[in-house]
A protein has these predicted regions:
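Signature of the first transmembrane helix
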Residues: 3-5, 11-17, 21-35, 47-107, ...
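Interhelical loop/hinge segments that connect adjacent transmembrane helices in multipass membrane
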Residues: 31-47, 51, 193, 217-224, ...
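Membrane-water interface segments that mark the loop-to-transmembrane alpha-helix transition
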Residues: 54-69, 91, 100-155, 324-345, ...
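Transmembrane helix-bundle signature of multi-pass secondary active exporters and lipid flippases
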Residues: 92-100, 292-311, 344, 374-381
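Helix-loop junctions and terminal segments of transmembrane helices
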Residues: 103-122, 298-324, 391-393
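Interfacial segments at transmembrane-helix termini and the short loops linking adjacent helices
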Residues: 154-170, 350-383, 426
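Hydrophobic alpha-helical transmembrane segments
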Residues: 162-172, 193-242, 407-411, 425-449
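Membrane-interface junctions at transmembrane-helix termini in multi-pass inner-membrane proteins
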Residues: 172-195, 378-406
Length: 473
């Protein structure tokens, strides 16, 4: 079976690294200002207002659940208490794992390829719809398995924590059925935000209306599931309108096999990051996880705003990916993002006692110390998020992501084993901090290595030999 064009250049590294050109210059915007294949004219530099606007749109669109959660978390904390919030933390961490397992963690890589596929006018629809069909088959099959497992779990009445894990896996998996990756790849952040805002508002209304009447952590996750339905439907309506129906899946096995490095690395990162509560639920009680979750929700809300910078810059980075100015632009953007993260970390540290008391109430006073430890991860998570979202996908360096994830996982495993002995939630937080610092350090070193390699390759390109005219005597 011949592989499709969109897979023809794939390597065992999942997606090929984009090579730098052998001569100065780069992608240029067409003289008429339209988007499309490179044309004549000088390279058009996006204004700061355009970049900030895209960041704001992605912040609310892609990570809106955090913003809505911050608005509703006082209600959740006071209705469910520390024990209920701990169970919800288990479900929400499983939500992120389920989302990752369904979409294979390759949405950023696929988004980075959308401009490339759309530039090939003759085969654009055929390639895009084949990719959509193969990707849908994988996601739909996995989400269905989660749904069956959830139904069986409720039928046999498994323990409450296990129910929350399976419910979270299914809710996260359903969310990953959306075609939002296409919108991000096309740079249509306003459209993405509009569609997702519908779901966020539905979640807010459902939570406020149902949770006080049915004070149960299951209800909070079910509200999130129901609110995902209109967003998923709208993204599919948009994709169908622009590209038509997805093609019959033919190469899903190839996509699965070659997505393994990215999937494994993302799963490892999620395991010691957003999915930590699911893993630590085996050694910590729900109350301890509830205290941890209180501070973690605030930290993740801020982190989501910082993560959005990388997503907003991804299409621009992809357009800059084939000229030497890419690394200078990347370094400047990373430095600014880390500075913002450091400022946010310091602000949260100072305001921790007031925030915990205001948002969660006096029952969660013990969360203050945990919050002050966890806010220190923000600069590190910002480094990792920016490099793995806006730089490595453009350079198609999946091995760098995998190695970083392995390093973080080794540290997290050590912290988990230590937690078995200490039975202290502080061990969880310190382990998370050390893991994030380790991974961020690795990615900075990896970024430096790739930049030096690309510059070395560009510097060693031989100049063309121009024959001299012979002078006759």
């Amino acid at each position: 079976m011949t592989e499709p064009d969109y897979l023809a250049t794939l390597t065992t590294d999942v997606f090929p690294r984009v090579e730098l050109p052998r001569s100065p210059g780069g992608v240029h915007r067409r003289a008429d200002g339209a988007r499309g294949p490179g044309g004549g004219g000088a390279h058009s530099k996006p204004s700061r207002f355009e970049v900030l606007g895209d960041i704001a749109l992605v912040s609310f669109g892609r990570y809106g659940q955090y913003i809505v959660t911050v608005v509703t978390v006082p209600l959740i904390a006071r209705v469910l208490g520390a024990h209920g919030l701990g169970l919800l933390a288990i479900g929400m961490s499983a939500y992120f794992i389920g989302s990752l397992v369904v979409d294979l963690g390759v949405t950023q890589f696929l988004s980075a390829r959308v401009p490339e596929i759309n530039a090939r006018k003759g085969t654009r629809l055929r390639e895009m719809n084949q990719l959509r069909g193969d990707y849908l088959a994988i996601r739909l099959a996995t989400a269905t398995l989660f749904g069956v497992a959830l139904a069986v779990a409720f039928a046999v009445r498994v323990p409450e924590a296990a129910q929350m894990v399976l419910l979270g896996l299914f809710v996260g998996g359903f969310w990953s059925l959306s075609e939002d990756w296409l919108l991000i790849g096309e740079g249509r952040f306003g459209t993405s935000t509009a569609y997702q805002s519908v779901g966020r508002l539905c979640y807010l209304g459902l939570l406020v209306g149902l949770l006080p009447q049915l004070p149960n952590p299951h209800v909070a996750l079910l509200c999130l599931l129901l609110s995902s339905v209109p967003t998923v439907a709208l993204t599919w309506w948009d994709a169908w309108r622009r590209y038509g129906a997805p093609a019959r899946p033919r190469y899903y096995g190839v996509v699965l096999r070659r997505s393994v490095p990215v999937f494994v690395s993302r799963l490892l990162v999620t395991g010691y990051g957003q999915g930590a509560a699911t893993l630590y639920s085996a050694v910590l009680d729900a109350v301890s996880l509830g205290l941890y979750s209180a501070g973690d929700r605030l930290v993740r809300a801020v982190q989501s705003l910082l993560d959005a910078i990388g997503f907003a810059l991804l299409p621009r980075m992809a357009r800059r990916g084939d000229h030497l100015g890419f690394w200078r632009y990347s370094t400047q953007a990373l430095a600014v993002t880390v500075a913002v993260a450091a400022l946010a970390s310091a602000s949260l540290w100072l305001a921790a006692p007031q925030l915990i008391r205001l948002v969660f109430g006096t029952e969660f006073a013990a969360s203050t110390g945990l919050l002050r430890i966890e806010v220190l991860i923000l600069p590190a998570t910002t480094v990792t998020s920016f490099i793995t979202t806006a730089i490595l996908p453009v350079r198609q360096d999946t091995s760098g992501v995998l190695i970083g994830a392995l390093l973080g996982t080794l540290v997290a495993i050590g912290a988990l084993l230590l937690t078995v002995w200490t039975r202290s939630v502080h061990t969880l937080v310190y382990g998370l901090l050390l893991a994030e610092i380790t991974v961020a350090t690795w990615h900075l070193l990896r970024m430096r290595f790739l930049a030096r390699r690309d510059h070395a390759e560009a510097d060693t390109v031989p100049l063309p030999v121009v024959p001299r005219k012979e002078t006759r005597p």
